[in-house]
């Protein structure tokens, strides 16, 4: 009798995706982050569902409902902090996953890469709207500042902002719709992940050498299932250390003050994972220019396949490109730091230099160095 796993229409899909999938034998721990992102999404959807059972999306009661979850709901504090810190873990995994793709040239799988960039935007939108829901000071002012950026769009800007707000300021209508969108978006993200995997399985995974690995494939199960379980355990360990020992480490103290439209916090800043983009936005004095730079700082990822000049796919055997890659990483860390600093000397000029360096490395330096490496190889 043929194995049901290979004949049943539903089990067959699972089997082809997670059991019999031919995977390169040499993929390193950097290939673990895809499954970890799936785990993060599952944690976020589950904890979010339980939070939504007790949360009220009304300006009068939102803040106190979150307080009620933490004080009165059984293990509500645990669910709330798992959700908040789970978002941070999600973005850490996202950045490492994207970084892996850049380093090893995975962006040459065009469809997979572009869907991935769309996924990044979707997750960022979800996280932004989620940050507004507790209705603390930083929630309110963060929502006001970021949505207000759309007013930089010529002609339709102001109308667009008021349409998104559902009034003339961030208020009850804004909070209600943000809650609705925050609830639905993770499921859209899950659907996009399916498409992401569909395209990935058309080509198969890349590997650290960047070479075709058809001659040396091994089954996904048991080799990579056990490897993914190890990664998952480490992720959960780090998450639970964060949640149980330092739940507010990555949060903002201002968000423990209820939203007050009459009192602006001294330093308005988003969550830590948006700070690099926020620093790029602030480094340009012009409003529209800043918004365009902000969008392009993420959208630039889509240009990587076009800017790939090297005759090799991966950076494994390209030491000059490796140096530039790590300079880019350092630059992003510098931007993240600057994004959290007040707008004053010397932070303004550091932010501007870091922003220029960010775009220069990607648009100019990496392609140029790739061409030099081609020459050095005498190919």
From Swiss-Prot:
Keywords assigned: Electron transport, Heme, Iron, Membrane, Metal-binding, Mitochondrion, Mitochondrion inner membrane, Respiratory chain, Transmembrane, Transmembrane helix, Transport, Ubiquinone
Pfam families in alphabetical order: Cytochrom_B_C, Cytochrome_B
UniProt topology in membrane: Multi-pass membrane protein
Entry GO CC: mitochondrial inner membrane; respiratory chain complex III
Record note on cofactor: Binds 2 heme b groups non-covalently.
Transmembrane segments: 33-53, 77-98, 113-133, 178-198, 226-246, 288-308, 320-340, 347-367
Residues that hold heme b b562 according to the record: 83, 182
Miscellaneous comment in the UniProt entry for this protein: Heme 1 (or BL or b562) is low-potential and absorbs at about 562 nm, and heme 2 (or BH or b566) is high-potential and absorbs at about 566 nm.
PANTHER family with a match to the protein in the record: CYTOCHROME B
Record function comment: Component of the ubiquinol-cytochrome c reductase complex (complex III or cytochrome b-c1 complex) that is part of the mitochondrial respiratory chain. The b-c1 complex mediates electron transfer from ubiquinol to cytochrome c. Contributes to the generation of a proton gradient across the mitochondrial membrane that is then used for ATP synthesis.
Family note: Belongs to the cytochrome b family.
Protein name, per record: Cytochrome b
Organismal lineage: Eukaryota, Metazoa, Chordata, Craniata, Vertebrata
């Amino acid at each position: 009798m043929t194995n049901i796993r290979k004949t049943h229409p539903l089990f067959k899909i699972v089997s082809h995706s997670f059991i019999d999938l031919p995977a390169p034998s040499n993929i390193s721990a950097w290939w673990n982050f895809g499954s970890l992102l799936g785990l993060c999404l599952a944690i976020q959807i589950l904890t979010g569902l339980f939070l939504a059972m007790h949360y009220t999306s009304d300006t009068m009661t939102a803040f106190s409902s979150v307080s009620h979850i933490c004080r009165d709901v059984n293990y509500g504090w645990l669910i709330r902090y798992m959700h908040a810190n789970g978002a941070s873990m999600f973005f850490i995994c996202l950045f490492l996953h994207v970084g892996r793709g850049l380093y090893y040239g995975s962006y040459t799988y065009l469809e997979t890469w572009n869907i991935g960039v769309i996924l990044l935007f979707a997750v960022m939108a979800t996280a932004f709207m989620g940050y507004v829901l507790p209705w603390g000071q930083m929630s309110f002012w963060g929502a006001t500042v970021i949505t207000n950026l759309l007013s930089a769009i010529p002609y339709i800007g102001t109308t667009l902002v008021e349409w998104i707000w559902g009034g003339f300021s961030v208020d009850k209508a804004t909070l209600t719709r943000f809650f609705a969108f925050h609830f639905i978006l993770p499921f859209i993200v899950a659907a996009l992940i399916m498409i992401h995997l569909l395209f990935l399985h058309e080509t198969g995974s890349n590997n650290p050498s960047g070479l075709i690995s058809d001659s040396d494939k091994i089954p996904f199960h048991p080799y990579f299932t056990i490897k993914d379980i190890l990664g998952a355990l480490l992720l959960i360990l780090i998450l639970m250390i964060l949640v149980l020992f330092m739940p507010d480490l990555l949060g903002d103290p201002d968000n423990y003050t209820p939203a007050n439209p009459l009192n602006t916090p001294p330093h308005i800043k988003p969550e830590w994972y948006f700070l690099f983009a926020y620093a790029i936005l602030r480094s340009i004095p012009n409003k529209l220019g800043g918004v365009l730079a902000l969008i392009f700082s993420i959208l630039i990822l889509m240009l990587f396949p076009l800017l790939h000049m090297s005759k090799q796919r991966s950076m494994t055997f390209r030491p000059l490109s490796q140096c530039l890659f790590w300079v880019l990483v350092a630059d992003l860390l510098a931007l993240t730091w600057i994004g959290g600093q007040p707008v004053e000397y010397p932070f303004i000029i550091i932010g501007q230099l870091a922003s220029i360096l960010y775009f220069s490395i990607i648009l100019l330096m990496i392609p140029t160095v790739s061409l030099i490496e081609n020459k050095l190889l005498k190919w």
